[in-house]
A protein has these predicted regions:
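Short, glycine-rich, amphipathic interfacial segments at transmembrane boundaries or analogous
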Residues: 2-48, 75-90, 201
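Juxtamembrane interface at the cytosolic side of transmembrane helices
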Residues: 4, 226-243
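Flexible glycine-/small-residue-rich
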Residues: 12-16, 108-110, 119-121, 199-201
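Short, solvent-exposed secondary-structure boundary/capping segments
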Residues: 21, 116-119, 206-209
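Soluble oligomerization/assembly scaffold segments of membrane-associated complexes
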Residues: 56-194
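Interfacial amphipathic helix/helix-coil modules
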Residues: 180-222, 235-238
Length: 243
């Protein structure tokens, strides 16, 4: 029989933190040759969603949570805490492939824009824990990215400020530096920087597969088949005895 698989889901709302403060500098050409100055680095919903399912992010999550022995339990010797000698040691790519295709599922509601992150696993407690930890990690990573980018932007703007004597440009740069400082302050104050949790994952009570109804139906069919086989065998035995 197939082992039961449980599905834990968390409902998320993307948080938009895009920085629109570059407008005053466009007319002065300050942004020329400097990519990414106008973005927050962590608040773009599409980028955050892409990061959530990316290989780099997933590899880091698997390593941080120590999931390699869990994902490949049949190859892991729990007693010696080493990979079995007669089994091929899985690679990071193997782990990403399994996690991305069989464990983690992400869907977006076109009408509402809400995102459902689901984890399917044999242990309901682990499924809910991984789902919630993924959200915590993506929020922390996007928040850190926003802070790093804003700090880089500020350093660049200070260089530009030292190279210009145009009063209007200086004022515009000061405004943008102020906006970048605000971006850092906002990022540091928000735990849910990229995704707001509407409904956190909880350990599911019933497996998503195999379903109980299907098990019952298969059990009935198997019982009928077994009964038919018994009847046929007895009938054949009775015919042989009569001969």
């Amino acid at each position: 029989l197939l082992p039961p698989v449980y599905r834990a889901e968390t409902l998320l709302a993307p948080v938009e933190n895009s920085d629109k403060s570059t407008g005053p500098l466009l007319s002065f050409g300050v942004l020329e040759g400097f990519s990414g100055l106008g973005t927050s680095g962590g608040g773009d919903a599409a980028e955050a969603l892409a990061t959530l399912t990316s290989r780099v992010f997933t590899d880091a999550f698997i390593k941080e949570e120590g999931l390699m022995p869990v994902l490949f339990a049949e190859r892991w010797d729990a007693a010696t805490r080493t990979w079995k000698a007669d089994a091929e040691m899985p690679t990071a790519w193997d782990a990403y492939d399994v996690f991305n295709r069989r464990v983690r599922f992400v869907s977006k509601d076109i009408k509402t824009g809400l995102i459902t992150l689901a984890i399917e696993w044999r242990d309901p407690e682990a499924a809910s824990r991984w789902a919630n930890r993924l959200v915590q990690r993506i929020n922390a990573e996007r928040r850190a990215a926003a802070i790093r980018e804003a700090e880089t932007n500020i350093a660049y703007l200070k260089e530009q400020l030292a190279e210009t004597s145009i009063v209007e440009m200086q004022q515009a740069i000061y405004q943008l530096i102020e906006a970048k400082i605000k971006t850092i302050m906002v990022a540091k104050s928000l735990d849910e920087y990229a995704f707001k949790v509407i409904d956190p994952a909880a350990p599911p009570q019933d497996p998503v597969r195999p379903r109980r109804a299907a098990i019952v139906v298969l059990g009935v069919l198997f019982g009928l088949l077994a009964s038919a086989v018994v009847v046929l065998v007895r009938h054949a035995s009775a015919r042989r005895r009569r001969r």
